[in-house]
């Protein structure tokens, strides 16, 4: 369900890379499935002729609003280190994952278990930009050069950092997440009382309500879909 596989207009592959997919469970990757893929890849004597699996990409929350548990993250992290490939976490909606009432994953856990992750800004009130984090000082050589080559290095981009400085002052980032989680919980309660059902159970502000075509058409009259 990773959006880089089906959305982003094929941006990853447009840069010369290949997105390899494995089965999902509740929108998440399972370490066992990733390991099965890696074992199959290396068991093939002709693997040098195939696309090399060079990184594991996950999103927290997932595209379905589900969350990785600490145990799941630790399992994926250990697997990646065993195979010497980086674990990258997409944190576009990270504020809402960290604020979910039942999560046992902290920002410190993510920094400890991943090789790179990013802190979403635009889905948390920022006007522009995301903050890429290399937890152990592992920024790739020539990282900024690569960013510039692909049109991702903005002039005066340091100003984007002001937003994150503000978001991480006085726990504003956490407060935004908690406010959204509480609002989503209230919305979920109201919709359930109205008889609505949900495609997946999500503890975040991503809620997937099941509607029939008539309901969608009625809503579309006032709200573009």
Short names for language-model regions:
Residues 68-100:
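Catalytic PLP-binding core of fold-type I/II PLP enzymes
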Residues 146-148, 167-188, 203:
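Structural signature of PLP-dependent enzymes
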Residues 185-225:
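Conserved C-terminal alpha-helix-loop-beta "cap" of PLP-dependent enzymes
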Residues 130-154, 165-170:
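Conserved core segment of the aminotransferase class I/II
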Residues 1-6, 35:
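Conserved PLP-anchoring active-site segment centered on the Schiff-base-forming lysine
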Residues 12, 93, 107-141:
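Active-site PLP attachment segment
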Residues 16-54, 58-61, 68-75:
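PLP-dependent aminotransferase-class I/II
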């Amino acid at each position: 369900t990773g959006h880089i596989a089906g959305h982003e207009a094929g941006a990853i592959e447009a840069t010369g890379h290949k997105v390899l997919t494995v089965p999902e469970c509740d929108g998440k990757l399972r370490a066992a499935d990733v390991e099965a893929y890696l074992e199959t890849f290396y068991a093939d004597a002709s693997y040098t002729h195939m696309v090399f699996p060079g990184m594991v990409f996950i999103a927290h929350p997932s595209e379905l609003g589900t969350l990785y548990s600490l145990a799941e993250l630790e399992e994926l992290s250990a697997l990646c280190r065993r195979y010497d490939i980086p674990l990258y976490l997409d944190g576009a909606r990270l504020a809402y994952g960290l604020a979910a009432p039942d999560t046992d994953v902290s920002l410190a856990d993510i920094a400890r278990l991943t090789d790179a992750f990013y802190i979403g800004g635009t889905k948390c009130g920022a006007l522009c930009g995301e903050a890429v984090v290399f937890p152990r000082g592992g920024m790739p050589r020539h990282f900024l050069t690569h960013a510039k080559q692909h049109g991702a290095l903005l002039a005066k981009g340091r100003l984007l950092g002001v937003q994150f400085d503000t978001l991480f002052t006085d726990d504003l980032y956490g407060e935004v997440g908690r406010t959204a989680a509480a609002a989503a919980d209230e919305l979920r309660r109201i919709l359930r009382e109205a008889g609505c059902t949900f495609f997946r159970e999500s503890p975040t502000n991503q809620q997937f309500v099941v509607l029939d075509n008539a309901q969608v058409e009625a809503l579309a009259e006032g709200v573009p879909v």
